[in-house]
């Protein structure tokens, strides 16, 4: 990468394609759609503090109906169940079933292995720099989207 905006954009696009291809293979091999996988992983990592469809939608910056479709599919397969909040009947808390917890744990392990593979040959300092730069770029992209 020479550092020009065009080269950067091309490299970022190519890296994104490679990442999506690897990630698609990961999700296809486990039998979940990417959105279902994200719901399972989100609940595995964040419940019970954040265990509602609106919390998931906000964390991903996606619509609640998109999350609801994934929740419905996982619920039909017995991987999660819903419990209405005792204090606020409008809120529905999502809970992983034992089978859902086992599936989420296996997915979490696969994602951790995938992340470690991506990080091979990259020093801790380089990772910190990369994360810092990516956070700045995400803010820039969010600002750009808000202006349009």
Where are these regions (language model features)?
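N-terminal helix-turn-helix DNA-binding core of bacterial DNA-binding proteins
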Residues: 21-63
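N-terminal leader segment of winged-helix/HTH proteins
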Residues: 1-30, 77
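Short, hydrophobic-biased segments on the C-terminal half of alpha helices
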Residues: 53, 71-72
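Alpha-helical linker/hinge and terminal dimerization helices associated
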Residues: 12-15, 19-22, 60, 103-119, ...
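Charged, amphipathic alpha-helical coiled-coil/dimerization segments
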Residues: 72-132
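C-terminal regulatory/oligomerization modules of transcriptional regulators
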Residues: 1-4, 124-148
């Amino acid at each position: 990468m020479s550092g020009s905006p065009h080269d950067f954009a091309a490299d970022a696009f190519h890296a994104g394609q490679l990442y999506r291809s690897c990630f698609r293979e990961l999700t296809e091999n486990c039998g979940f759609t990417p959105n279902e996988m994200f719901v399972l992983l989100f609940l595995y990592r964040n419940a019970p503090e954040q265990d509602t469809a609106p919390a998931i939608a906000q964390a991903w910056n996606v619509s609640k109906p998109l999350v609801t479709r994934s929740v419905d599919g996982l619920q039909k397969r017995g991987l999660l169940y819903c419990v209405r909040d005792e204090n606020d009947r409008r809120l529905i808390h999502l809970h992983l079933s034992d089978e859902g917890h086992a599936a989420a744990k296996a997915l979490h392990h696969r994602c951790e292995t995938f992340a470690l593979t991506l990080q091979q040959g990259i020093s801790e300092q380089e990772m910190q720099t990369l994360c810092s730069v990516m956070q700045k770029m995400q803010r820039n992209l969010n600002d750009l989207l808000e202006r349009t």
